[in-house]
Amino acid sequence: LTDHILNEISGLEEPTRNHQILASLPISTYWTTNYDNLIEKSLQKENKLADVKHRVPHLAQTKKRRSAIVYKMHGDISASDETIITKDEYESYPLKYAPFVTALSGDLISKTFLFLGFSFSDPNLDYILSRIRIHFSENQRQHYCLVKDIEKNKLTDDEYDYQKLKLNLMIKDLNRFHIKAVLIQDWKD
């Protein structure tokens, strides 16, 4: 099953314009839950050397002359047998991948994050953000996320109101973690 899912997303995609924009910025640390290698491809096109971390032992190693670190907390397409994809794997993540939890916690405490294309439904990130909120309360670092606003399009009034309510509740919830949502109308913006 894991191989089938990962084969569906493997290697066929090319980085988007947004990937290229991110790679061109002076960003030294990337965290992703994606298995693909689009960030790495984008960095390579910018002549930047990525130090990719997708296994626990990678965390203790440093690639010389690296331009950026890419943390792939749920694994990499190149090691499909080690990806985090099932509910059981998500549930055991804080124990089996504790060094990733520690590293991400440290970065969330000491660095400002910009979340892009993230649904905030990942239980591992929720676990980490919750622990930081409990420990640091109002002394958390401010983070940001880009969220696409709800479009009326073909939605009925009731559907639109429901989607808008869900979005507003998510934004309110993100505020608990000091994540400010910036609404955009179109991803091209």
Q: Residues of each region from the PLM?
A:
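Active-site glycine-rich loop that binds ribose-phosphate moieties when present
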Residues: 87-102, 128
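Short beta-strand/turn micro-motifs composed of small residues
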Residues: 32, 74, 147-149
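Metabolite-binding pocket within alpha/beta catalytic cores that recognizes anionic/polar moieties
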Residues: 1-52, 80-84
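SIR2/sirtuin-family catalytic core signature
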Residues: 14-25, 45-50, 59-67, 80, ...
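Active-site metal-binding loops of divalent metal-dependent hydrolases
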Residues: 35, 75, 118
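Short gly/ser/thr-rich secondary-structure transition/capping motifs
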Residues: 12-13, 52-56, 94-98
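Class I SAM-dependent methyltransferase SAM-binding "motif I" and its flanking Rossmann-like core
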Residues: 64, 69-86
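Aspartyl protease catalytic domain
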Residues: 56, 86-87
